Every structure is written in structure tokens, then in C-alpha cells.
Amino acid sequence: MAKLEILEFPDPRLRTVAKPVEKVDDELRKLIDDMFETMYAAPGIGLAATQVDVHIQLIVMDLSEDHNKPMVFINPQITPLTEEQAPYEEGCLSVPGFYEKVTRPARVRINALDRDGNAFEVEADELLATCIQHEMDHLDGKLFVDYVSRLKRDRIKKKLEKIHRQQG
């Protein structure tokens, strides 16, 4: 396994819309393993392929504290199950050190393929619903900072650009 570089806001590659995965094979499973290694090392609870500059519809997540519940979503489709909205404070490996409250549908259904290409469906609420919606935004070229005011987004962008300049 190999740790991958995580793109950071405002990198324009984060705005790329991901294409569907056409074939689930050993090459894709290696990418999945590398993404889990990268996510755990960061540390984080979710990572979309877009964040590691691979523009396919692939998400890895693990909400457990001891990293024993890995979830893979290939070509995920999401359906809100309620009109109710739930606010959660979100962070992102591509926007390190910043957290903002984002309101999203409280319950959703996800249809996707697993790491072996088998179709599955899961209903989610609370943190799982928030996380999958956050990661699916990445596949559409969106970031959680797109949900905050332009002023806040510009402030975050300037702070991250300053950090990148200082790091050389």
C-alpha cells in the first residue's frame, strides 16, 4: 500500500467532476487500499478519489474509532429520505484545520457497488448521512466551504494559501 497526496483547497483539481467507475478490478482495489491508508494516516473518516487526484466515483469511509468498519462506495447514488435537515460541523482533509456548520438532509439512501463490484443499499442518518453527502459533494467538484458565506470562504482560502507559501 502507498500513502497518496491529498489535494488541498483552493487546488482547482478539487473542482473536477468524477466519472463513473467502469471496471472493478485489482487495480481499483489497490487504489481503495491506498486511499484507506491515506485516510487513516491523515487522520480522517472519509476520502473521495477526487481528493487524491483520481477523478472517478469512489469513496472510502470508516467512522469507527479503531478503524475496523471500512466502507467502500463505488458509483454511489443518493436519495434523500426526508425533508428534515440536520446541521453538522464539518471538516475536510482537503481544507485542513477549518470546521464549519453545514446543513444537509437528515436521512438518505445510498445505492452503490462495494469493493468487489456487488451492488448494495444502505440507509443513513446522523454522522453517516453527513459524511456520505460530504464525500459525494467531492465527486461533483464541491467542497463544504461552498456552503458558507463568500466572506468566510475567501478568508479560509487566504489562510490556506498563506500556509502553502510558508511551507514552500
Swiss-Prot record:
What Pfam families does the record tag this protein with?
Pep_deformylase (PF01327)
**Which cofactors?**
Fe(2+)
Q: Which reaction does it catalyse?
A: N-terminal N-formyl-L-methionyl-[peptide] + H2O = N-terminal L-methionyl-[peptide] + formate
Give the EC number.
3.5.1.88
Active-site residues annotated for this sequence: E135
Recite the UniProt cofactor note for this protein: Binds 1 Fe(2+) ion.
A molecular function (GO) term? peptide deformylase activity
Any coiled-coil regions, as ranges: none
Residues reported in the UniProt entry to bind Fe cation? C92, H134, H138
Q: Which Gene3D superfamilies match?
A: Peptide deformylase
* Role: Removes the formyl group from the N-terminal Met of newly synthesized proteins. Requires at least a dipeptide for an efficient rate of reaction. N-terminal L-methionine is a prerequisite for activity but the enzyme has broad specificity at other positions.
**What is the protein's given name?**
Peptide deformylase
What lineage, starting at the top, does this entry show? Answer: Bacteria, Pseudomonadati, Pseudomonadota, Gammaproteobacteria, Oceanospirillales
Gene (name only): def
